[in-house]
Amino acid sequence: MDQLERRIEDLEMKLAFQEGTIEELDQQVIKLNDLMAAQQQQLRILITKLQSVEPSNMANQSEESPPPHY
């Protein structure tokens, strides 16, 4: 086998490896995208719940008098 054929074979092997790697990375991106979409939905639900909570009747810290030991 001459050097040119060996170089072509090496390039074909590298290309096959890169194609496999790209496919694996693509699958990971899809999984992460699905996970991010689910987390965004959970965050929207949490924000909605927090916005519907009645405000606390406790005074702000700036309005509180200092504790007796001061």
Swiss-Prot record:
PANTHER family, alphabetized: PROTEIN SLYX (PTHR36508:SF1)
Similarity comment: Belongs to the SlyX family.
Organism (species): Shewanella sediminis (strain HAW-EB3)
InterPro entries: SlyX (IPR007236)
Protein's recorded name: Protein SlyX homolog
Gene designation: slyX
Family annotation (HAMAP family): SlyX
